[in-house]
Amino acid sequence: KPLILCTFLLIINFFSAQKKPLDHSVYDAWQSVGSRLISNDGKWLGYYVDAQEGDGNLYLYSTINKTQQKFPRASKLFLTSDSKFAIFTVKPFYKDIKAVKDKKLKKDKLTKDSLYIINLSTNKIEKIANVKSYKSPFKGGSFVAYLLENLKEKSTDSPKDDDKDDAKDDDDKNAKPSELVVINLATGQKQSFQNVVKYQFSENGKQLAFVTQKPEEKKDPKDKDKEKDKPKDKSKPKKYALQSVNLVNLENFAINKLIEEEGDFAQLTFDKSATQFALTGTTSAENDLVKDYNLYYFSKNKNAVLNQKSAKMPKDWVISENQAPNFSKDGKQLYFGVAPKPIAKDTALIANDHAILDVWSYKDDYLKTIQLKNLNKDLKKSYDAVLQTEKPELLTALSHPKMDSIAIINEGNAPFSLGISNNDSRAESQWTGAEKKNYYIVNNLTGEATEFLKNLNGRIYPSPLGKFMVYFNREDGNWYAYNVDKKSTTQLNKGLAVQFTDEEFDMPDYPNAYGLEGFTDKDFSVIIKDRYDLWEFFLDGKTAPKNITNGFGRKNKISFDTYQLDKDIRSFNRNAEMYLFAFNEENKQSGIFKTKIATAKNPEQLQMGDFYGYRNLVKAKNAEVYSYTKETYQEAPNVYISDNFKTE
């Protein structure tokens, strides 16, 4: 018997030894589902499967044919607004990228990205090598523009994180001019532009803006050596290269040159209709310690250049290079940044001859550690200004150091903005942990600010059309609505026995709210949740609130949340079906329900099960096609697609 027992134990140990040990090499290979994208017509789903460390894969799935294709190392997927083309880049192998970074080699030692363009009808794939970046209009059919790598110029850059956004490349002041190729994918028409450093489509795909830069003249190596030996005269102005800003009409590829000067121009911005255009730029010397920036505005009827000499510009303030201009949705207002003129650094001081101190006072707004952390951000701080495009030569400063931020209202269409200031509570927040804020209605024509709310410890939500400011006060746990026209405030949950703050909060602080889910059309009402259910509060203050899930959530211990399935739709239709994410607190099941706000009945269950899913639901813009993930503690997240949530 002892012999048999020993033999049995040896067998167990042998098989146990065959198991692969759990180390970095194992969990580096673990995979997870990444972001998902559905074509507007719902016929195509793109999703990523990412490795913890290594090369991920992109999958393109046909919801019609139930087939899919795999593309290793793909990223930056875009499905054109007409749902006819898929565009993405393919990166070098992860091991090659890592080797370049580990060895601190220059980027030109690495294979460049490739661009793939797939015709979704024919499955024809066009591959373009050595692509630095690409863009396609969000709502403009089948156009694509891509900037090729400048392989003639050797890079002097350190290796960068390839996952960073391409927008940083667009504003890279050291970018080398290269070839920009624009293609109308629907017709095959192609146009190339040389020496391009920046480019941008209008949202509707009707216009393309790009900036060209005159390349540096090639110098004889002998002359370069002589220049190295000469002492550099930093006082002598060094001019920028000659740049030109151009607009391309994408119907006929006609070019309109707007600017041609020695300078640096960036932040190319169109309005929604592509009939107005703005950008920032400087024509100061490249080695000036303080540069003067201009805001350029162009339209069919009027052009304007704004700078520190413009009417109504605050004294000793300038146009900010650190805030991109932004048109209102209706194109009648243009928001941009202004800032106090920077003080030039004294380059004559010798650092070793002067003490460098960090001095802190108990009266400072922030702890010194916070000040140092935010130093670069504070040096680039911009304040908001606006101009009316009917009179673009006049600006109105909206924010300033005592009211240092604003929120634009109704996508910028409103004649006023929401001013926000935390100046009065900054020092206090060092020990309370919460910043109380004051709120103002700021007139976009005059800049006059009228305070309507003081010392709010909570959060404020402007309604989509700007008729109301709904806010939650953490200190009393109540919801309020401020009527902008009537200048009156109403407590929304007055008289309700339901608690709208965290019922299980057990810390010595004020509890947070469960959240505001959104507004209904025309600023009619607001949807706010308690622990389980959703409530509709009518902003006119005359109608009693309704529990739109009819108490079903609290009765069954199911918590409901809404979805935002279309970013272009900013409010709920009270009579349309809306989908709700559901989570059962008792058995931990999750699922999806549907209801209508106007009916206030028990929501209809579509699916509920022993999994966690539906939290990250995405929808096709023009079709009833949905994608979601489901997972359990035993099964990793899987991707599903459905048109009714009953079959998948």
Q: Where do the PLM segments sit?
A:
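Sec-dependent N-terminal signal peptides
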Residues: 2-11
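Beta-propeller folds
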Residues: 6, 15-625, 631-637
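An N-terminal hydrophobic leader/cap segment in hydrolases
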Residues: 633-648
